[in-house]
């Protein structure tokens, strides 16, 4: 796992088309913004796991 340190307003790049920006930090919560092409799905992990469970339950 790559571990990076970013400050509010700083961005990291994933490939050529995806950016992740730190929008704010409040206590133990971090707000991030993700810019990605429409064909790239972006989900919180718990939502992604629910989608996968629903797919395998069909």
Swiss-Prot record:
Alphabetical list of SUPFAM superfamilies matching this protein: CsrA-like
GO molecular function: mRNA 5'-UTR binding
Cysteine pairings via disulfide bonds: none
Record Pfam families: CsrA
Entry annotated with the keyword Zinc: no
Gene3D superfamilies the record matches: Translational regulator CsrA
GO cellular component: cytosol
Major place of residence: cytoplasm
GO BP annotations listed: mRNA catabolic process; negative regulation of translational initiation; positive regulation of translational initiation; regulation of carbohydrate metabolic process
Keywords (A to Z) from UniProt: Activator, Cytoplasm, Repressor, RNA-binding, Translation regulation
Cell compartment(s), UniProt: Cytoplasm
InterPro entries in alphabetical order: CsrA (IPR003751), CsrA_sf (IPR036107)
Family from the record: Belongs to the CsrA/RsmA family.
Subunit record text: Homodimer; the beta-strands of each monomer intercalate to form a hydrophobic core, while the alpha-helices form wings that extend away from the core.
Family matches, as NCBIfam families: csrA (TIGR00202), PRK01712.1 (NF002469)
Protein name: Translational regulator CsrA
Species: Psychromonas ingrahamii (strain DSM 17664 / CCUG 51855 / 37)
Phylogenetic classification of the source organism: Bacteria, Pseudomonadati, Pseudomonadota, Gammaproteobacteria, Alteromonadales
Gene: csrA
């Amino acid at each position: 796992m790559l571990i990076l340190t970013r400050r509010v307003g700083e961005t990291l790049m994933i490939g050529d088309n995806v950016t992740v920006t730190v929008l704010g930090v409040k206590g133990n919560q971090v707000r991030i913004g993700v810019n990605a092409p429409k064909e790239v799905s972006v989900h919180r992990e718990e939502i992604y796991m629910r989608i996968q469970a629903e797919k395998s339950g069909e």
